[in-house]
UniProtKB/Swiss-Prot annotation:
The modification Phosphoserine is found at residue 204. It is found in: Mitochondrion. GO terms for cellular component: MIB complex; mitochondrial outer membrane; mitochondrion; nuclear speck; nucleoplasm; SAM complex. Pfam families: DnaJ (PF00226), DnaJ-like_C11_C (PF11875), DNAJC11_beta-barrel (PF22774). It comes from Homo sapiens (Human). This is DnaJ homolog subfamily C member 11. Belongs to the DNAJC11 family. Keywords: Acetylation, Chaperone, Coiled coil, Membrane, Mitochondrion, Mitochondrion outer membrane, Phosphoprotein. The keyword Phosphoprotein applies. Residues 417-457 form a coiled coil. GO terms for biological process: cristae formation; inner mitochondrial membrane organization.
Amino acid sequence: MATALSEEELDNEDYYSLLNVRREASSEELKAAYRRLCMLYHPDKHRDPELKSQAERLFNLVHQAYEVLSDPQTRAIYDIYGKRGLEMEGWEVVERRRTPAEIREEFERLQREREERRLQQRTNPKGTISVGVDATDLFDRYDEEYEDVSGSSFPQIEINKMHISQSIEAPLTATDTAILSGSLSTQNGNGGGSINFALRRVTSAKGWGELEFGAGDLQGPLFGLKLFRNLTPRCFVTTNCALQFSSRGIRPGLTTVLARNLDKNTVGYLQWRWGIQSAMNTSIVRDTKTSHFTVALQLGIPHSFALISYQHKFQDDDQTRVKGSLKAGFFGTVVEYGAERKISRHSVLGAAVSVGVPQGVSLKVKLNRASQTYFFPIHLTDQLLPSAMFYATVGPLVVYFAMHRLIIKPYLRAQKEKELEKQRESAATDVLQKKQEAESAVRLMQESVRRIIEAEESRMGLIIVNAWYGKFVNDKSRKSEKVKVIDVTVPLQCLVKDSKLILTEASKAGLPGFYDPCVGEEKNLKVLYQFRGVLHQVMVLDSEALRIPKQSHRIDTDG
């Protein structure tokens, strides 16, 4: 199965893999690995001009890796940000002997400065499209005396309301942001719209303020003020003041929310709303890696209710979530259950069934695509009909699994293969260069490998008979795919010391004499070796550690 190909996979040298040391290697381990490779690649050991040139280039690369990893500061930068972090401008002004945490903060500061130039042109578009569907005719049929009316034999499904909203942000300075938003709504043939403009200023690291002006065709001008402030590291408060002008006069409104972190995963909220729909609300929200739990109680005019909801988060690649809630108040009782799942890199599809009195049964379908939301509330019936509940539950599941198998999965697979092929084409030059470097390294190893084999044979030690690296395919696959495996017998034999071979938990593509023959795909290392005159065989994943010889690798020839 193909894996995502990152830029770092193409641009960054793995210095740990090059030296074949652990990421936690001590200075002594680094020095020993450096000396061994220096003896192998030192230009003075080769007389042939071509080999001497190749050795000089590899020697410089090994020296660069050792220089980076032997210095605590550059090593910390490399561990956190890779080779690109070392190339970031501004490190020359950083004081020496900083901790990794301080280096991380400094890097982020430099990165923010670089991004400020792009800030002026950056927006944060957000949009919502809601389409209300009246499908009650599917379940709430008229009496038989009306069935003779022309066209009544087919249920009528209507769109009875729509809502569209959009907003964009325009950063003016590092602390000021302008926000423009608008919305249009229509219900049963009547509609209206509004437009709002807001200016937000970050006053300090602890707070910000926002001024808002709005106008619409159904309501008069709106003036608002929002304030946010961190009172303590665990407590914050927000206040929203609004003045709504209409033909009936001025309608003031005030909303204040006080929140406090009760523990690492739990937040308590206390909300007071005065003026427009006055109410007092308190809630506790607990959010963990595997669950999201909410309990709330509201006393207000005209609505008072109690709410409890729970959401379970599955730890799968599709980020599947199932949820359920119970809401009871003066308006009635509503039970809601549903699920959502990631269907692509930027899209999440969800569906929920709402069953309540006196609302009836509704199906709510929601699609989040990046920062855009598409919402489809479908009203099925005003009554509590088991048939409506059944179809609202089973219908979306059947449609989803059918679409996922017949449309979504094939489309994503085709897109992934297309993207992978494009990445392979763009990486072709880099792969060719890595291949030439690996071949040069193998030529430089020949003399050392000959001496190692002689020493190992004299004591019946470790001899690498054959070694292959890359993507292994079965016999049914196309023969052309077999070129994705390369012979790495010589490079592995060169790493043998005292009848032992130890490879760390890093991609083998960075080892001397190796290269990546199948960029972006899963790879394995297969080794056939001889120890004490007995054949052994082992296969490991690309980033899996390997230590040979081992008794468990022995090939049983008795049977």
